[in-house]
């Protein structure tokens, strides 16, 4: 999945879209649209649409929910931010920078998983993270790969300034780039990581399992829309955890359908799931979302985004956007809360109250 903010283009495009398309206020309604893009942890969205599970839960609450696959990840978030969708699959980092940073109050309705090895820093030859000093590193700039690199460098007392530059490289070109003599190190995500590590001399220096719980994959929804239409949240969460139950039980038909939709086979999809910490039960998701570690993670993410100039247009500090947590606490500006981690609906699922 292209988990990235393409420089400041996404933010500028979003600002224009908001000015033209954002609704004045959320209203009670019966038809909803949700966008998603291909990634191991989000394949259930395609399955619950194709299988009729989403329709079943929507009908239970007397509403209609359309689940739409968007091939461009950043574009899906931009369209959500501009009001074309009521919800979208996104990482915590990209939610903070694009919709929340752009002034669209957004709620993490479902905390689905975190990357636990899917993203990695890879060196050509032997060595450790400290050996990146003085070397160029190829990655998708301003993406979770960039964030992973920053966290890795920090762990050994280095920063990006100690490198011989970061070279913005498309994920589509990453495998070919690693094979060239000029490229010494890359940061990318699966399935590219698995392919590159098959190359002779490729050494994994650091991966997302070294920062567990920091690259989080979510289903986020417009806060005002959710507040005006709680049945929308109930239907989405109910459908999601029905599919989680199928996955947890090893339902091969469901898993094979997800694998094929993501362009791999069952074995390949299971390999990707192995480096993804899926929260198959709502209770697990609630526990993670209520943890003391989440606010610290979001502060780290906000500082990274501010340092790169993408925490909202004209953000004066890393505290520009407020983030609220289930216990009522906040990080960032408590007077500008635009991102909310809310366990209400996941707790309903855990309690069997949907």
Predicted regions: what they are:
Residues 27-169, 184-190, 213, 353-354:
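Short, glycine-/small- and polar/acidic-enriched structural segments
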Residues 13-14, 24:
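Cleavable N-terminal signal peptides
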Residues 228-314:
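Secondary-structure end/capping motifs
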Residues 55, 78, 82, 96, ...:
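Solvent-exposed, polar/charged alpha-helical surfaces in well-ordered, non-transmembrane soluble domains
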Residues 94, 166, 172-267:
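Pocket-lining segment of extracytoplasmic ligand-binding domains
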Residues 302-354:
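Conserved C-terminal helix/tail region of periplasmic/extracytoplasmic solute-binding proteins
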Residues 20-26:
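Sec/Tat signal peptide C-region and signal peptidase I cleavage site
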Residues 1-12:
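Bacterial N-terminal signal peptides that target proteins for export
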